[in-house]
Amino acid sequence: MPEDTSYSNSFEDYYNNSHAISPYKDSFYKEMTPSKPNVRFGDDDVNIFDQRKKVNEINKNNTVKRSIPSSISTTITPNKSSLKSPRGKRASKNSFDNETKLESKNETLKEVNDAVNRCYALCNIPTKHVSINSISDLAQTFETLAVGITHETNRKAECERSKNAIDSLYYHEQLEKKELNEKSLQMAIDHLLKVTKQNLRQADDGNKLKETEALKSFIEEIEEVDDNKISINSLQQQLLEEKTANNILRRDYYKLQERGRRLCHEFQELQDDYSKQMKQKEYEVQKLKNEIKVLLNMNDNLKAEKAHYSQKEKQYFQKYTYIEKYMNHVKEEYNRKEDECKKLNFIIDKSMKKIEHLERSLQTQFTAQNSFSTAMIQEEGPKDAHLKDRYHKVKEFMEQKLQTSKINDPSCSEAEALDNVLCLIESSMKTLDKNSKCYPIATKKCIKYVTDSPRLKENEHVTN
């Protein structure tokens, strides 16, 4: 993958200046970084702190411990003047340089890890929760990530240089060891032990003490060779762990880069959608403004019409009040006239009934009088031979008048009808008595015969 060097100048300024502020220590990313974020790339669940476990162990185990072989007696104290040999100076200088480089690497690795963790956390934001502010923050984060990637690339180059230096040191140490003959080394060690024992027994001999000091210096040189070998092994182990950490970081970097491409694509789509939505919103806002103007004009017109109609309403209300009062007065007059009309109608109906009753009575009386006068029995002699026949004629006349009376006046009872018929007969008889006084006996006999009939006996009050 090609290396992005667009932000290499910022890293070089930070790396060359020991008092510069790290571009990765941004308070914004500390606030955005959760306590333990989990990032999903495809089908892999990546836990940041689990992936960085080995890297943190490397940071804790960076110092190289120098130990004294157990074969050498601790009672022998080396002379400080013997450590000033050229070989000892070179070894101590190389060790100091290595420790300085390791400390610098530790700080750089820690800052890169912090930057990667922050990028992991920001990449874990769901797309549906991404807003315009978070997109701009994410763009700024990718800029910082690019700086961190450049920093990581330079750190890898520095690790390669350290590896080459370690390999060179190990090669020179091997050459120095090859110069020593194993047999002579064993003889020297045996001689050293022998002389040491003699020096312990004979401490007053000055020449032996000088020889002992020389042997001590020789032992210290051998110890330095062993310590250098231990340091080389430690550095090799550290280099292997750093390679493992670099592989992890490289894999995470590729995943972050792919995630960044997707987010950039989504960011571009969101920008396009946002632009379209803003244009649509502006169009809708302008449309609403125009509608508001039209509505305001309509509102003004409605207010003017409302004032005009209010004035008309007052006028109509005054007219309505006057009309209502007049209608109430007319209604009262109408009710009064209606009551008077009802009274008059009642009187008229009553009078009409009386008139009709009188007319019917008069007509009946007149008809009965005429009929009875024609049906009256004339006396043929001293004997009443035809009295029974005349009685039947009178009886038929009375029944006919009774039926006529019931038809003309249905409300009239049978007793009243009989009373009316008898009154007619009586009046007719009186008229006959006045006009023809020569027939009083025959008339009395006829009336007596009629009143003795069974029909009249049923109505005793009429007979009485």
From Swiss-Prot:
One of its GO terms (cellular component) is spindle pole. Residues 99-119, 156-193, 231-365 form a coiled coil. GO terms for molecular function: structural molecule activity. It is found in: Prospore membrane; Cytoplasm, Cytoskeleton, Microtubule organizing center, Spindle pole body; Cytoplasm, Cytoskeleton, Spindle pole. Keywords: Cell cycle, Cell division, Coiled coil, Cytoplasm, Cytoskeleton, Meiosis, Membrane, Sporulation. Involved in the pathway that organizes the shaping and sizing of the prospore membrane (PSM) during sporulation. This is Meiotic plaque component protein 54. It comes from Saccharomyces cerevisiae (strain ATCC 204508 / S288c).
